[in-house]
Curated annotation (Swiss-Prot):
It comes from Streptococcus mutans serotype c (strain ATCC 700610 / UA159). This is NADPH-dependent 7-cyano-7-deazaguanine reductase. Catalyzes the NADPH-dependent reduction of 7-cyano-7-deazaguanine (preQ0) to 7-aminomethyl-7-deazaguanine (preQ1). Disulfide bonds: none annotated. Belongs to the GTP cyclohydrolase I family. QueF type 1 subfamily. GO terms for biological process: queuosine biosynthetic process; tRNA modification.
Length: 162
């Protein structure tokens, strides 16, 4: 990559990283996708996601799976890590966390397709696994999003692996 392509990336390689413990959308950064002529998935797995229950203040733990088909922009991975870390002291329901993450990334990237799946560890004997997806309107990706939403969990895993 040229210096011009990475001039707006402020976090990658920064030795004085500031870890924000409160939700902060402005942490996210993107760079140009040099393969816009290809449809391809980029997938991130975050096995150490934490947030707080908005009622009890107790920590919630999850693995977050994020997959997307980029268009013009790709998310910079260190900024994504710090953005997800910023949920550490953020009090919100699991469903809201996953939907907010998805919408923030759609706003930043304008991807062709994006999905976020949160697999939260059980609390009180029940686990919650919210799923968000987006397909660009009036394209095949909108149809893909509808199909994947309807079929995303046909064969649910057992939860004894968490």
């Amino acid at each position: 990559m040229s210096q011009e392509e990475i001039k707006d990336l402020t976090l990658l390689g920064n030795q004085k990283t500031n870890y924000n413990f409160d939700y902060d959308l402005n942490i996210l950064e993107a760079f140009d996708n040099r393969h816009q002529d290809n449809d391809y998935f980029i997938k991130f797995n975050c096995p150490e996601f934490t947030s707080l229950c908005p009622i009890t203040g107790q920590p919630d733990f999850a693995t977050i799976y994020l997959s997307y088909i980029p268009d013009k922009k790709c998310v910079e991975s260190k900024s994504l890590k710090l953005y997800l870390f910023s949920y550490r002291n953020h009090g919100d329901f699991h469903e809201n966390c996953i939907n907010t993450i998805g919408k923030d990334l759609v706003d930043l990237l304008q991807p062709r397709y994006l999905e976020v799946w949160g697999k939260f560890t059980p609390r009180g004997g029940i686990s919650i696994d919210p799923y968000y997806n987006y397909g660009r309107p009036n394209t095949k990706y909108e149809e893909m999003a509808a199909y994947r939403l309807m079929n995303h969990d046909l064969y649910p895993e057992t939860i004894d692996n968490r």
